[in-house]
Amino acid sequence: GDWPEPHDDFFITQWTKKGWVRGQGVFDVEMPNFNKDYSASVDSMPVPVITHEIGQYAVYPDLKEIEKYTGVLEPLNFKGVKQELENKNLLEKADDYLSASGHLAAILYKEEIERAMKTPGISGFQLLDLHDFPGQGTALVGLLNAFWESKGVANAEEFRQFSAPVVPLARFSKAVYKNNEQFTADIEIANYSSEEINNKNIKWALTNASGQPLQEGIIPLTNIKIG
């Protein structure tokens, strides 16, 4: 259903009667916008909401994974992709396809998780998936492969920047700015740790691609409740 029943203690869903609560149906029809969240979709929700199977962003097969299947399970899907690339003289592009699709997936997972954390009415999320799922055909939806190994597109430290007990968040209007435009952002903190954060200074910095600070400052003596 699209709304909880009278006796439900919580509600797990990908959409409500008021709209989507995951990136599907949003990211592919809207320009990138980091001000938005899913508040309108969960307005007046009477119970906690868990977003269902968010993510599912496909990554091109890592053909180096073929040699890891040494038991009874044959990676026929990977072998089929490899054969198709060979037939089209594109096998040398396989690593480029993996890298490009993988880094795009990492960006989308980041925005997916951060948008959920920006929504006051969402209590948690179920991810599909951190690793590829080989149980039903081909579901190469992970930043890790089926062996729980990195695909080289995001390491644990990078992933924890947007999926951790405490996550800094920024709201701003678009992804691309011209050099004559002013950049303005609102800073938020998602705190799902075991305790409140009290009387702490929050240091922020805006850096360029080389990591050099363009602007920085301190938000003084901030109290952050759990949630």
Where are these regions (language model features)?
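Substrate-binding/catalytic cleft of secreted carbohydrate-active enzymes
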Residues: 1-144
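Extracytoplasmic loops and strand-loop junctions of Gram-negative outer membrane beta-barrel proteins
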Residues: 32-33, 168-170
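Generic beta-strand/beta-sheet core signal
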Residues: 52, 128-131, 162, 190, ...
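Short acidic, glycine/proline-enriched helix-loop-strand junctions
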Residues: 142-153
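Proline/serine/threonine-rich low-complexity linkers at boundaries of modular beta-sandwich domains
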Residues: 153-167
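Short beta-strand segments of immunoglobulin-like
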Residues: 172-177
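Beta-strand-rich binding/interaction modules
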Residues: 180-223
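Low-complexity, small/polar and acidic-rich linker and loop segments
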Residues: 225-227
